[in-house]
Amino acid sequence: MMAPPMTPRELRSHLPALSGFTWLNAAASSPTPQPVFDAMNRFLRDTLERGDVGYPSWAKAKDETRAHLARFLNCTPSELAFTQSTSFGFHVIGQLLKQRGITEVLTLECEFPSTTLPLLFDGLTLRGVRLRPDGTAPIEDFEAALTKHTGAIAVSAVQFGTGLRVDLHAISKLCHSRDLAFIVNAAQGIGHVPLDVTALHADFLAATSHKWLMAGYGTGMLFVKKAWLESTQLPFGGWLSVEPSEQFQSWVHATRTDDAHGFTATGTKFRTEASALEAGGGSWVGLVALDAALTLHEAVGVANTLAHAQSLQTLLRTELRKRGFVPTTPDARETLSGICVVPVQGAPMDAVRALLREEKVSTTARAGGLRISTHVYNEEEDVLRLLSAIDRLGIRPAGV
């Protein structure tokens, strides 16, 4: 018999930081849950007391974490690489797109730079779809913006500066009908909204650990669809990019030869699993944290997380509107995420954020407004404390 899902209140009890702060800032970062900290601490204590004697068990744990993430995203472990950031993942994606002859990528004009700048640095041309005045981006606007040169569409599952939850399935269908690569920036999505890369027919997905995932800073995740791994060359390599039996050869006299299946070096081919993109050693403690965080998310259920965040957003937006604030995206359930951004009158947004921080309320200044995030660990009292602080500090909506 399956255990009942962990409730938001039960999860909240695992975050000691919430006893001293009203944390409405998951879109920037989340506090570390106690089980995640404990897992990291056990690993670090082991290295303190035994050095790297436990290395074989670390390697096994890395494989288990990769398999855990694969279940979470509904893909195979061989399609996943661990990186240090979403931006690094998008650099890899840009290089693989270029190998396929793709030169132009369509995205939203309001995309976060971890989507756009890596692709620009990789030499790709970007075209942007502008949000409508109501803050939405209907699929027909994407379709109208396509050109004969467009080879891919890249979007964030949730927009960082507005909170718009993009219709990924509609974009996926458009990509499939036009033979375009489909790329998802999941930095604001993973651990926040359900993501199934198989159901989405995604070609790539890149994400990070420290926001909604609650796994601390420093670990990135990259999904590369198997077909891309088998038909493109590694954009770079390292000792972990070759078979284990060849990892300790010097290769000093090797020569590189390109063929249809990838690079060869004196008869040796690089691996075609996504993990070959890791090239070298990474953050073991970050992977330990990721595995523990995934366990928490599975205990709650990501669909339950989104529903809880939306419920708090409904309360928040209703009360903000009573005070004259206007969120930059609609309240409709189909586009609603755990992010709300409202323009504020007067002082720079960073100053408003700082005033709230003095009240022990954590928010963020983004896209010219105050960004308020509701996550699974939040409760109605958090929203009410924010509203009380807004009233007490005399923070007013823009245009009033």
How would you label these PLM feature ranges?
Residues 1-400:
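Pyridoxal 5′-phosphate
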